């Protein structure tokens, strides 16, 4: 189960950013090259475990796009991308997000009250982006049926529980100076 993903995570190079051990992986960083078989493995697994009775697959620009797009192609469900710049379309919703390493503004377009969506993200660590996104979607009246993160690091996912959302994290990891350690795989509980 998710053997390509687990193997690729274990082989991820680690760099230091200050005191932070940062793993470099195709799903979270786009480097090295993104293996289409890896993306296929991930999207196949998501389609099996997620509530796919939705109107739209939603992801945040940029690194959630490869997996969310593969899932959209596999299921025929449209894909909506939350962007980092405004388009000034009618109904555009602006939200501020803050993570452990950045702050910014995101823009949601094309969703309306009553839409049922699944969120697909590459990594959840602090939970800042997903927390702001889910709050904004709930304010609009969009039903968040599922939140999927390919990789989980830390306990930021716990913040989503406060909003009544239980994210599904495919692979939970720890990152140390010596490398990535697989802590859990969704479905092994």
From Swiss-Prot:
Q: Which organism is it from?
A: Methanosarcina mazei (strain ATCC BAA-159 / DSM 3647 / Goe1 / Go1 / JCM 11833 / OCM 88)
Question: Known catalysed reaction(s)?
Answer: IMP + diphosphate = hypoxanthine + 5-phospho-alpha-D-ribose 1-diphosphate; GMP + diphosphate = guanine + 5-phospho-alpha-D-ribose 1-diphosphate
| Gene3D superfamilies assigned | 3.40.50.2020
The record, for PANTHER family, names: HYPOXANTHINE/GUANINE PHOSPHORIBOSYLTRANSFERASE, XANTHINE PHOSPHORIBOSYLTRANSFERASE
Q: Which Pfam families match?
A: Pribosyltran (PF00156)
- Highest taxon of the source? Archaea
The transmembrane residues are: none
Name of the gene this protein is made from: hpt
Q: What biological-process terms (Gene Ontology) are attached? A: IMP salvage; purine ribonucleoside salvage
Query: What does the UniProt record say this protein does?
Result: Catalyzes a salvage reaction resulting in the formation of IMP that is energically less costly than de novo synthesis.
The pathway entry for this protein reads as: Purine metabolism; IMP biosynthesis via salvage pathway; IMP from hypoxanthine: step 1/1
Alphabetically sorted, this entry's keywords are:
Cytoplasm, Glycosyltransferase, Purine salvage, Transferase
Compartments in which it is found: Cytoplasm
> This chain belongs to which protein, by name?
Hypoxanthine/guanine phosphoribosyltransferase
Any one GO MF annotation of this record: hypoxanthine phosphoribosyltransferase activity
Q: How does it assemble?
A: Homodimer.
């Amino acid at each position: 189960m998710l053997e390509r993903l687990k193997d690729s995570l274990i082989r991820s190079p680690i760099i230091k950013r200050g005191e932070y051990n940062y793993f470099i992986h195709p799903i979270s960083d786009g480097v090295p090259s993104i293996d289409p078989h890896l993306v296929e493995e991930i999207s196949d697994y998501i389609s099996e475990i997620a509530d796919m009775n939705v109107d739209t697959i939603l992801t945040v620009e940029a690194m959630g796009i490869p997996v969310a797009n593969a899932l959209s192609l596999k299921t025929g469900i449209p894909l909506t991308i939350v962007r980092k710049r405004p388009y000034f379309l009618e109904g555009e919703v602006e939200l501020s997000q803050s993570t452990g390493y950045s702050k910014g503004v995101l823009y949601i377009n094309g969703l309306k009250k009553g839409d049922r969506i699944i969120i697909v993200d590459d990594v959840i660590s602090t939970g800042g982006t997903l927390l702001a996104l889910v709050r904004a979607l709930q304010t609009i009246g969009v039903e968040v049926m599922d939140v999927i993160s390919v990789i989980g690091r830390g306990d930021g996912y716990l913040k989503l529980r406060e909003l009544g959302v239980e994210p599904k994290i495919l692979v939970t990891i720890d990152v140390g100076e010596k490398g990535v350690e697989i802590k859990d795989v969704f479905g092994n509980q």
